[in-house]
Amino acid sequence: KITEVNVADTLKEVRRALLDADVNFKIAKDFTAKVKEKAIGQDVLTTLQPGQLLVKLVKDELTELMGGDVAGINLSGNPSVILMSGLQGSGKTTFSGKLANYLQTKKNKKVLLVACDIYRPAAIQQLYVVGDSIAVEVYSEPENKNPVEIAQNAIKHAKSNGFNVVIVDTAGRLAVDEEMMNEIERVHKAIQPQETLFVVDSMTGQDAVNTAKTFNDRLNFDGVILTKLDGDTRGGAALSIKTVVNKPIKF
């Protein structure tokens, strides 16, 4: 049987591995406690060591936590409006282009990219460069400093020009601040998107949890996008965010 004694070391290793992978401390602690609760008292097959069975239980628990089903993008509207949210530098603009390309090539949609970041220098130009590289039209109003108006006008433009999907790229900030949250809330309320996505840099580590929670409390987003997984990240942010906000990781 599995007992506290014969799996104590393995559980310690599991917790250390989670912390090394940037999983939030409390979540790592709760996770191992849950695995331990399920494991204690289980019969071990003669061919297995208690530690080996525990590894299987850890894998099962991770699968259950992350959700076995693939969550797609909601494209029900006409046009379908997708709102991007997240901190500055998380990769919203680049991902907006990747999503537009995916919807255009794989789903046969006519996509409009909308530049609503009126603060960051060259944000609008960046979206144009991205749009040009994938042959997707970009809507912007460089003189207009009201992102709500820009987004609303873009949707009107999309309706009258036969676009199926509108992807709204919004401004990020270096940290969560009230002004930024109020602005994206106003945009969200005005355009009523079918899909609100929270884009997070997977290398953010522990802090990703607090940011995700703040955005989710204000926008009740539909899914998470993890960027920069090709860096030196260990992906712990995925586990932490999924646990805290219980929203699917879509890409």
Question: Which residues fall in each region the model found?
Answer:
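Residue-level detector of functional hotspots within protein domains
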Residues: 9, 73, 124, 182, ...
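Short, small-residue-enriched loops and turns at beta-alpha junctions
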Residues: 89-90, 119-121, 145-147, 172-176, ...
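Low-complexity, compositionally biased segments
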Residues: 9-12, 25, 120, 204, ...
